[in-house]
């Protein structure tokens, strides 16, 4: 009988020790120590990895803008990465694919059955969309004179009925 009570006592002690260890989860070994993240470029220290990531982005800025060879290589990279996304229906260009996706909703006919796509045949062949580019901000503006096109649009062909 004595052996049985000693065995229960050992199990209880072991369980208590495990619970004590589990209650310390999340504490650093020395107590109040915090983890520090250091920038490899300038050795500045940050309290979180996210803050370090934001700081590291600042090192990607142009260091010496007066070096012409460096500017030439950067402009070549910019033209390769800055792709435009033209609308396959009307030809308007967008800087981001997400903007093109939002624009494509305009080509969905609300009066026809849902999902009917208005195609290039909706516009006459002589219609051109003029795209102007602002040099200061890089945004593009499309100019389209809809009043002059009203008599040229073939509503019957596209929608299957005449709209008055």
Curated annotation (Swiss-Prot):
Which domain of life, per UniProt? Eukaryota
Q: Which GO terms describe its biological process?
A: cellular response to hypoxia; regulation of DNA-templated transcription
Q: Which GO terms describe its molecular function?
A: DNA-binding transcription factor activity; zinc ion binding
- Keywords carried by this UniProt record: Metal-binding, Nucleus, Repeat, Transcription, Transcription regulation, Zinc, Zinc-finger
Per the entry, what induces it?
Answer: By heat stress.
Q: Where are the zinc fingers (C2H2-type)?
A: 37-59, 85-107
Query: Where is this protein primarily located?
Result: nucleus
- Annotated PANTHER family: ZINC FINGER PROTEIN ZAT5, ZINC FINGER PROTEIN ZAT7-RELATED
Function, please?
Probable transcription factor that may be involved in stress responses.
Protein name per the record:
Zinc finger protein ZAT8
Q: Which organism is it from?
A: Arabidopsis thaliana (Mouse-ear cress)
């Amino acid at each position: 009988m004595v052996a049985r009570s000693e065995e229960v006592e050992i199990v209880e002690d072991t369980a208590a020790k495990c619970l004590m260890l589990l209650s310390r989860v999340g504490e650093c070994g020395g107590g109040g120590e915090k983890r520090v993240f250091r920038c490899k470029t300038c050795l500045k220290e940050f309290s979180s990895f996210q803050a370090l990531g934001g700081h590291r982005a600042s090192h990607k800025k142009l260091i010496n803008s007066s070096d012409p060879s460096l500017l030439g290589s950067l402009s070549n990279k910019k033209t390769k990465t800055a792709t435009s996304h033209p609308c396959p229906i009307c030809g308007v260009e967008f800087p981001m694919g997400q903007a093109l996706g939002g624009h494509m909703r305009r080509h969905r006919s609300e009066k026809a059955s849902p999902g009917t796509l208005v195609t290039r045949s909706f516009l006459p062949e002589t219609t051109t969309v003029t795209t102007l580019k602002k040099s200061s901000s890089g945004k593009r503006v499309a100019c389209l004179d809809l009043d002059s096109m009203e008599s040229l649009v073939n509503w019957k062909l596209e929608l299957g009925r005449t709209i008055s």
